[in-house]
Amino acid sequence: MRLFLALLALGFAAVAAVPANPQRIVGGSTTTIQQYPTIVALLFSRNGNTFFQACGGIILNNRNILTAAHCPHGDAVNRWRVRSGSTFANSGGAVHNLNRVRIHPNYNSRTLDNDIAIMRTSSNIAFNNAAQPARIAGANYNVGDNQVVWAAGWGDIRSGGPPSEQLRHVQVWTVNQATCRSRYASIGRSVTDNMLCSGWLDVGGRDQCQGDSGGPLYHNGVVVGVSSWGEECALARFPGVNARVSRFANWIRNNS
């Protein structure tokens, strides 16, 4: 799930990383894994027995998955599994155990700065038309304002909405950094240079949401963002916020 922020009497706080109910993309439509073979479903278990889709991830190679740090942060590695090669969140494809989670050393769980992590599977991911390594933005990959980008995932259709078993996608646009920073500053949140904002500014209705955390934001087929946080979902005034992949290109390469 993507974290969303709730206004509390004493300030602002992030909602817990794993929600009470598993989660979908807001304002999008259903799609198939063959259209997005680089995405995987991350499965979480509270008891070590029953697993459900809780976040998304991105295939880097046949053993490593890129995701948001807030998804596995603080959890034992055996609480998470990876489902690759399936259109559906909780069935099909291949399920892999994990043997390592590497969270960015500068990850800040309060501000969600540097919200990026790499999970290593215990077994190889077999590549086919439903599972492929992603093209990842390099350090010099710059995305301009108002560029068309696509998000995909199994998250909520609205804040607190019902789960989507089938993969969904939505077209949104990149948002000017200064504008995004100013909007969030008005409610006491910090948007850093390590973040990339996307949505349908001043219109709303399209966004990533809970359950989409860790999933990809694509620009011309290149992963430029990892879904991270936002103020609820799909609000006109507040875009979604992603980890900006180009800022972590060297770290990703060195740890995968």
From Swiss-Prot:
Disulfide bonds: 55-71, 180-197, 209-233
Pfam families xrefs: Trypsin
Catalytic function, reaction form: Preferential cleavage: Arg-|-Xaa, Lys-|-Xaa
Presence of keyword Lipoprotein: no
Record-annotated site: Required for specificity: 207
Subcellular locations according to the entry: Secreted, Extracellular space
GO BP annotation list: proteolysis
EC number: 3.4.21.4
Domain of life (superkingdom): Eukaryota
Active site positions: 70, 115, 213
SUPFAM superfamilies linked to this entry: Trypsin-like serine proteases
GO cellular component: extracellular region
Record keywords: Disulfide bond, Hydrolase, Protease, Secreted, Serine protease, Signal, Zymogen
Domain Peptidase S1: 25-256
Gene3D superfamilies: Trypsin-like serine proteases
Residues making up the signal peptide according to the UniProt record: 1-17
Family: Belongs to the peptidase S1 family.
Name the UniProt record assigns to this protein: Trypsin, alkaline B
